[in-house]
Amino acid sequence: MAKKPVVIGVAGGSGSGKTSVARAIYDHFGDRSILVLEQDFYYKDQSHLPFEERLKTNYDHPLAFDNDLLIEHVHKLLRYEPIDKPVYDYTLHTRSNQVIHVEPRDVIILEGILVLEDERLRNLMDIKVYVDTDPDLRIIRRLIRDIKERGRTFDSVIDQYLSVVRPMHNQFVEPTKRYADVIIPEGGQNVVAIDLMVAKIRTVLEQKSVL
C-alpha cells in the first residue's frame, strides 16, 4: 500500500496561537516534509461585489470561506498532486489575481479559526487540534496583527471585535473544541504539547507508510 499524507487540523480563536503551533510543528519536520494551508487564504472571491459591500464582510462566519475549493485542494494533495493556493487581498476585500504554487508533502496542516467547523474537512483529518487561549491575550494579538499586517486602525479592530469577532467566536469557533483530539493551551509556547504532537505525527506517518 502506497503511503498517504497525514492531515492535521489546527483550529482556535483569532489570536489564539494557531500559527505558532503550526510553525512549531513545521520546524520539527522541515519544508521538504510538511506544508501549511491557511484557511485565511480561502476566503470567497468577492470581485463581483461593489467595494462598499465587501467592507461589510463577516470574516468570522463559516459562510465567508470557500471550503469547497479548500477541500478540492486537500484531495489533490492527498493524491500527491500540486495545487495553486489562492491569495486574499485584505485591503481590497477580495481574492487577488495571484496564486501560490504548492507542492505536495507528507504532512498537511490545515490552520484556521473554523477548520473544525465543516464536517467534510474534519473527515479528511488524521489529528484534530484546538488551541485554547485566554480571550484578553487573543484580542491583544489580533490588534497587533491587524494594525501591522492589514492596515487597520485601533478603533476599527476594537469595533469589529466587539460587534463581530467575539459573538462569532462564541457561536461558531468555541463549539468546535468538542471535535478536537488534542486541546493545546498557550499555543506554540506549550513545548510539552508540541513535542507530544510531533511524536504522534511521526507515529501516524509510520502507520501510513509502506511496511
Swiss-Prot record:
GO terms for molecular function: ATP binding; cytidine kinase activity; uridine kinase activity. ATP binds at residues 12-19. Its EC number is 2.7.1.48. It is found in: Cytoplasm. It is an enzyme of class 2 (transferase). GO terms for cellular component: cytoplasm. Pfam families: PRK. InterPro entries: P-loop_NTPase, PRK/URK, Uridine_kinase, Uridine_kinase-like. Pathway: Pyrimidine metabolism; CTP biosynthesis via salvage pathway; CTP from cytidine: step 1/3; Pyrimidine metabolism; UMP biosynthesis via salvage pathway; UMP from uridine: step 1/1. Keywords: ATP-binding, Cytoplasm, Kinase, Nucleotide-binding, Transferase. One of its GO terms (biological process) is CTP salvage. It catalyses: uridine + ATP = UMP + ADP + H(+); cytidine + ATP = CMP + ADP + H(+). Belongs to the uridine kinase family. This is Uridine kinase. It comes from Geobacillus thermodenitrificans (strain NG80-2). The lineage of its organism: Bacteria, Bacillati, Bacillota, Bacilli, Bacillales. The gene is udk.
